[in-house]
């Protein structure tokens, strides 16, 4: 009996020793920001302190565990809504959660989390090289640049809670820029990206966001088919429709043109022949060129199929293989207009030249007669 009591006491002591470091503050919680730690000035963010399960009570610290004045002496429950966010809120944060059974009553501090406040400088630009459509496994470079001399650039993917990627800006030809490399494209890296810039003395006060850039991973599903109605060669001014179809049940089709800045998208419609199709009307005034289409599903809009085989659309009788824009006159109409101007100008100039020649000829004839008859005749003529 005594041996059993001693054994239970040893087990209890062992459990206390194991629990002590966790409940006594050695097991770190983590601090989260929702919807994102990158917050526009005037926006809002909710901070929560977690440890396995969310703490009922927690305290917030900013920069080296110093209380922010609005946090001083306050214990938060569930979460803290920071609104409206100002530049004063930018910086490093940690939290401590309450542990009723720990000696100190509080956990160890969490790892720091950075709150970045945006909208403090003019937005930079974001480009993808070689382009925003990236085949699975291939490399893409996202370049953030600005004519403002930013010391650092940040790249952030929407709806991702982790801190943005950060690079030092390189100055070249009066432009500050940074190249963010994605070495091997995969599903997890596709999405909408924005970039920001910051200056040295305020590293967590960022510029306005760049325009959004959608990075799409392709080559994940079988390719659809692309055809032209009435055909890939049409008469000038004739309408043409491009049809993208597949037996795969794609929800959306995307049409891209080589050299085009934007793709067009249309929902797929199920046809009686059990194919899923979308018809893209180009109309008589859109450009010809080489087209491809892709398919995607509703639940993964940034994950596309292999591209269809390329389809060259051209205009017969037009050497440029493209239709003129409604706001741009064709070369033929421009030449005719130039010819009309030349003809009109010539009609005015020819009679004027004849009249000038006639007057000059008459003047010379009178002068010749004057010289033949002598000075007296000339004076009489005057």
UniProtKB/Swiss-Prot annotation:
InterPro entries: Ig-like_dom_sf (IPR036179), Ig-like_fold (IPR013783), Ig-like_Receptors_ImmuneReg (IPR050412), Ig_sub (IPR003599), Immunoglobulin_dom (IPR013151). It comes from the Eukaryota. Changing residue 13 to F: In allele KIR3DS1*014. This is Killer cell immunoglobulin-like receptor 3DS1. Expressed in NK and T-cell lines but not in B-lymphoblastoid cell lines or in a colon carcinoma cell line. Disulfide bonds join 49-95, 144-195, 244-293. Receptor on natural killer (NK) cells for MHC class I molecules. Upon interaction with peptide-free HLA-F open conformer, triggers NK cell degranulation and anti-viral cytokine production. GO terms for molecular function: MHC class I receptor activity. One of its GO terms (cellular component) is plasma membrane. The chain crosses the membrane at residues 341-360. It is found in: Cell membrane. One of its GO terms (biological process) is immune response-regulating signaling pathway. Residues 361-382 are cytoplasmic. The lineage of its organism: Eukaryota, Metazoa, Chordata, Craniata, Vertebrata. Residues 22-340 are extracellular. It comes from Homo sapiens (Human). Residues 1-21 form the signal peptide. Belongs to the immunoglobulin superfamily. Interacts with HLA-F open conformer; this interaction is direct. Pfam families: ig. Residues 42-102, 137-202, 237-300 form the Ig-like C2-type domain. Glycans are attached at residues 92, 179, 273. It is a single-pass type I membrane protein.
